[in-house]
Structures are given as C-alpha cells and as structure tokens.
Amino acid sequence: MLYLLSELSGVFSPFNVFRYITFRTGGALFTAGLFVFWFGPWIISLLRLRQGKGQPIREDGPQTHLLTKRGTPTMGGLMILAGLLVAVLLWANPRNSYVWITVVVTLGFGAIGFYDDYLKVTKQSHKGFSGKFRLGLEALIAVAACVAVAEYSAPGLAYRLAFPVFKDAIVNLGLFWILFASFVIVGAGNAVNITDGLDGLAIVPVMIAAATFGIIAYLVGNVIYASYLQVNYVPGTGELAVVCGALIGAGLGFLWFNAPPAQIFMGDTGSLALGGLLGTVAVATKHEIVLAVVGGLFVLEIASVIIQVASFKLTGKRVFRMAPIHHHFEQKGWKEPQVVIRFWIIAVVLALLGLATLKLR
C-alpha cells in the first residue's frame, strides 16, 4: 500500500522513494523478518499447546530423529505466510496482477498443506489426505494461475517458453504451455515439501532461490536491463522482487527458530506454499527452465524419491539407503549439520549457475 504514496510525491517529494522497487524490496524483507521474529515465540507456544505431541516422526527414519525431533510442533509455515503477507500488502504495488497471482497460489498451496498437517497431527500419522486429491487441488490452483499469467502477459509472450543461454530462443507451445507451467508450479511445491526433512535444510535453499529469482524478476521487468542482457522483457514482473524480498525476510525470521535444534517445523503449510511461490515467479518471469537449475537441490530430492519408488517396484531393490536423499547421507554416517550445510553449499552454487544463464548468450 505504501507504493500509492508515490503518487503524492508532487505534494511531498520524499514519497517518491516508494516508486523504487529496490527500496520496497528492502522494506519488505525487513518488515517480514521483524514480524516473524517478534511474533514467532507466541505462535510457537500456541502451536505447541494446540498440537501436544507435535509432528509425528517416521519410525523407519534415522533413529536419532526419534530422540531429537519428537514433540516439536509443526505448521510453522503459518509464521512465514503471515510475515510474507503483511510485508507484501504493505510494500508491493497493489495494482500489479502478478503480485496477486503469486499471493493466491502461495495461500492456496499453504491451505492445502495446512489441512494435510492438521490431519497428520490429529491422527498422529504420516499420512494426511489422499495424495491424488492433494495433487488435484494443487493442479487446479496452478492451472488457474497459469491462465491468469497468460492473460496478463505482454503480446508475444503468452503461451511461450523461453530457453536460457540461446539468444531469442522462445517457442510458442500454445495451450500445452498451461500444462507445462502448471507442472512447474506443482512440481516446485512438492519438491520443496520433500526437501523439508532436516532442521534448516529447506528454508535456506528456498531463500537462496528467492534471492536469485528476485534478481531475475527485477532484471526482466526492466526494459533497459532486459535489452542489455538480451532476455525477454516481461512488463510488471519487476514487482515480484518485492514478493521475493518478503519471502527472504520471513525465511530469516523463521530460521531463527528452525535452526538446529529446531523449535518448530514449517510443515507442509510452509513447504508447499513456498515451493508454489517460487514456481509461480519462475512462470511469470519466463524462466521456468532456469528454476530447474536454481532449484536443482529440490529437483535432486524429489528425483531420489521417484527413483527409489520406481526401482523398488520394478526390481525389488532400493537405489538409496533411504529416500529422500538427505536421509541416505544420514544413513551413511553424515551428521545432520553436515548434510544441511553441504546441501546449502550446493544450493548456492546452483543459484550462481542460474544467474550466469542471464549473461550467457
């Protein structure tokens, strides 16, 4: 809402600062972080009181988890989403369609994750509601979002897929683009969800990806920078940098409480929502393929589960000691902090590779 003050800059010139995306991105980051940090202890206490036993821990998982993680409350994604929403409403341009599309997907995926977490906690079971039904709901939200993105895209960009590195490589997929882009959003949500298995493991790579796509959104939403980098100029997407800034701030606030030993888990409430947000930003900025690079860690995690399940069904043998792959390394003797920090390093390297695609032509 503060963006609207820029329209009064003729009356009070300092209000002109609210025109700048970079300023508002910083404001969103600070606001979201402060909100989560300030209200975090109260939210954690409330969730612990309501949930009692907290998130159920896998009996077939690493045995150390049964001792160190049992009783920890889940649904910490509520903290992240609250901080994110407050910051976006305060600092983003309320007239920007891409902002609202991203917010709707984030809250929609968050609601699905919340219900799943609720069932797991109340039943003290790892099984929430039907996986097929959950994917169906996610797909409906994603398809609606992709149709909206196509509707608001500039002429010549709707239903088109851009390829990184290659100059002017953009293909008109027609309505198939809706299916592809929806797959990106749903896949991103579930990939982050799979990754969220150790203290701090998911939130830091999410913030790294958000920072990367915040930069991408800012550049492709600026006609001068887009022309210089020879990437597709996508009007209006620069405002998504503010959303990414809010995510980073909320993530930092959450990490304060999620750092090992975690006081709270984000749960499906957070992981599905944040993955959906990243997928939507990638779709809006026409950098869907780059998301597979920047979010390569998430791709690796979900691929390990797919490979494990497929191998066991086809051959009766497991490729990994345990899936997702972060548990595989735990079973090999890596300590939890080793797995987490090494995976963070991988996320940083992949983010830099993703940014490099902007310049390579």
Curated annotation (Swiss-Prot):
The lineage of its organism: Bacteria, Pseudomonadati, Pseudomonadota, Alphaproteobacteria, Hyphomicrobiales. Its main location: membrane. The chain crosses the membrane at residues 27-47, 72-92, 99-119, 139-159, 169-189, 200-220, 240-260, 264-284, 289-309, 338-358. Belongs to the glycosyltransferase 4 family. MraY subfamily. InterPro entries: Glycosyl_transferase_4, PNAcMuramoyl-5peptid_Trfase, PNAcMuramoyl-5peptid_Trfase_CS. Pathway: Cell wall biogenesis; peptidoglycan biosynthesis. Catalyzes the initial step of the lipid cycle reactions in the biosynthesis of the cell wall peptidoglycan: transfers peptidoglycan precursor phospho-MurNAc-pentapeptide from UDP-MurNAc-pentapeptide onto the lipid carrier undecaprenyl phosphate, yielding undecaprenyl-pyrophosphoryl-MurNAc-pentapeptide, known as lipid I. CDD domains: GT_MraY. It comes from the Bacteria. Its cofactor is Mg(2+). It is a multi-pass membrane protein. It comes from Methylobacterium nodulans (strain LMG 21967 / CNCM I-2342 / ORS 2060). Its EC number is 2.7.8.13. This is Phospho-N-acetylmuramoyl-pentapeptide-transferase. Keywords: Cell cycle, Cell division, Cell inner membrane, Cell membrane, Cell shape, Cell wall biogenesis/degradation, Magnesium, Membrane, Metal-binding, Peptidoglycan synthesis, Transferase, Transmembrane, Transmembrane helix. GO terms for molecular function: metal ion binding; phospho-N-acetylmuramoyl-pentapeptide-transferase activity; UDP-N-acetylmuramoyl-L-alanyl-D-glutamyl-meso-2,6-diaminopimelyl-D-alanyl-D-alanine:undecaprenyl-phosphate transferase activity.
